[in-house]
């Protein structure tokens, strides 16, 4: 799998978990202290995300960070 595909799938998983929690992008950003303008490209798989950012997002969503890397 190429890098862009990994980023896209990670972003899709983040979006899935955010929606399962019933959070808007704005609410999610508030919970993980990340600007909405930075979250949108992450969820769309357009930018490479740091481990620290992924950990903050997982904590805000109350999921194990490994879940972001589970691809069906």
Can you annotate each of these PLM segments?
Residues 18, 29, 58:
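The alpha-helix within a helix-turn-helix
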Residues 62-72:
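Short C-terminal boundary/hinge segments that cap the last helix of small helical domains
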Residues 38, 48, 67:
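Residues in the helix-turn-helix
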Residues 46-56:
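Short, basic-rich loop-to-helix N-cap that marks the start of a DNA-contacting helix
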Residues 21-41:
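Short alpha-helical DNA-recognition segment
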Residues 15, 26, 55:
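Residues within the helices of the helix-turn-helix
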Residues 1-20:
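A short, Lys/Arg-rich alpha-helix, primarily the initiator
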């Amino acid at each position: 799998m190429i890098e862009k595909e990994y980023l896209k799938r990670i972003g899709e998983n983040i979006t899935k978990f955010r929606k399962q929690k019933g959070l808007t992008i704005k609410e999610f950003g508030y919970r993980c202290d990340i600007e909405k303008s930075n979250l949108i490209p992450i969820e769309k798989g357009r930018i490479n995300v740091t481990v620290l950012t992924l950990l903050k997002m997982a904590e805000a969503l109350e999921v194990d960070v490994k879940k972001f890397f589970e691809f069906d």
